[in-house]
């Protein structure tokens, strides 16, 4: 879950993307209630584009019980989704990583498509 603090605009990301969003505790920060039943663990709050905590948690899980594959969805394809897909591919190179394009969106349709192509070039399987 994309998570920022009230001082977001003072961060490197905030200076380059000066659009306050996903501020902890505000409307729009929480994952939609309709998805609660599908969750098996608490959400991981990620304060940057890619989550090293997500990668570490999945690596630990994989070491205990082999992960067959990972599917990513979300916003923004061209920022957070691609960052996490590449991070997971580097952390778990033998686990197939999928991105379901129907459940992703980029800043623009063009940047969405460019991100999907970049992920495909890095052996991430894009479901179209």
Identify the residue ranges that each predicted region occupies.
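Short, solvent-exposed turn/loop segments enriched in Gly/Ser/Thr/Pro and often Arg
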Residues: 1
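Active-site-adjacent betaalpha module
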Residues: 4-128
């Amino acid at each position: 879950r994309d998570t920022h603090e009230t001082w977001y605009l003072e961060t490197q990301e905030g200076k380059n993307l000066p659009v306050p969003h996903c501020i902890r505790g505000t409307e729009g920060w929480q994952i939609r209630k309709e998805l609660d039943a599908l969750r098996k663990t608490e959400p991981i709050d990620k304060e940057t584009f890619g989550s090293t905590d997500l990668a570490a948690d999945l690596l630990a899980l994989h070491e205990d019980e082999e992960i067959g594959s990972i599917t990513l969805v979300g916003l923004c394809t061209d920022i957070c989704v691609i960052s996490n897909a590449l991070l997971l591919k580097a952390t778990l190179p033998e686990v197939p990583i999928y991105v379901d394009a129907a459940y992703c969106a980029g800043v623009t349709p063009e940047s969405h498509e460019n991100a999907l192509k970049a992920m495909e070039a890095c052996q991430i399987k894009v479901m179209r």
